[in-house]
Amino acid sequence: RWMTSGGLGTMGYGLPAAIGVQVAHPKKLVVDIAGEASILMNMQEISTAVQYRLPIKIFILNNEYMGMVRQWQELLHDKNYSESYTEALPDFVKLAEAYGAVGIRAKTPDELDEKIKEMINSDQPVIFDCLVDKQENCYPMIPSGKPHNQMLLGPEDEKDVSDEGKTLV
């Protein structure tokens, strides 16, 4: 099953949605794929997952930016970047451990397969901090105020996608 906020700009949607889905489907694998800024909107809810032994998996695509905001600024506002980058991020592995969850980090693409298996095989809540290219864009993208049929599908030429970005596809 797939749940999404559908490009509505609902930063922070994924973590509480994952908790609700895990309660509704306790035997299913539930993975929240989100950026680090989205997770920080309500990170405290990981305590709910730990308290109720909900084995949700939080897979953070960590580029140290509000990724979609940075991407809008790049593609739609002539690279006029404003307030979308932060150096003041927590160590998500330590944060997971502080809550009593499992923390995993992947720094390079060659680590992904093994660490994703570790995440999936855990019977506890997991925060997976996946460090990604800071300038990699995420597609498809629905520009602010546009309908779904006007989504941006990405560079027409694959040469515009970094090797790190291709690894995640």
Where is each model-derived feature located?
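Thiamine diphosphate
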Residues: 1-169
